[in-house]
Amino acid sequence: PSPSPVIIKEVGDNSSSVERYSHLYTELYNISRDTRRSTVTVTGISEDIDWFNNTYENKGQTTGLIVANNGIEQLILTDYETIRDAQSIKVTYFNDLTVEALVKGTDSNTGLAVIAVKNYMLPSVLLDEKLIAKLGSSRSSSLLGIPVIAIGRPLGNIDSIEYGMITSKGNMLNLVDNNYELMTTDLHGNKDSTG
């Protein structure tokens, strides 16, 4: 007797699976696009002198996240290293407006700083409450596998985006003044990454 033919039943067609996959990434991009309005480019500027005794500007750039507005100034969380030795700090918004900022506080243990832009320097569109980033909580025990989106400069370029997921939680970082619970992701970065 000849063997019975193998019948393969297709569950859903491939094009709809590809379309669903593409739609998922479109939705992730839309979330990142909307969230990027809460990010700014922070430029730390300092003057240096070259070997020929000529003065030149040295600029470092990173991403900042609008985290609050106290009614007097807008507060932005950013990378401390980029502004550490800066003689002036500039903040550039999504609409290309660039204004001066001042350092409010720094934490060398975490590598973070808070800078401030005076409200009177900003048009009303940049004072909108919707620009303040909505921060989540890491207290949940079921964070493993949750999708994450890195915005800012995760690949070292301004306005780059990277997608991944939380891969571990629970490792502790013990520093002088505090203990921090670390979460890791499968996002990769490079030495120029911030965001």
Provide a role label for each language-model segment.
Residues 2-66, 75-76, 88, 143, ...:
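N-terminal activation segment of mature serine protease catalytic domains
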Residues 45-49, 151-155, 171-172:
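Short beta-turn/strand-loop junction motif enriched in small, turn-promoting residues
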Residues 50-59, 105-110, 116-121, 169-183:
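Gly/Ser-enriched beta-turn/beta-hairpin loop segments
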Residues 58-62, 97-99, 123, 162, ...:
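Short beta-strand segments
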Residues 68-152, 156-159, 187, 191:
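Conserved active-site neighborhood of the chymotrypsin/trypsin-like protease fold
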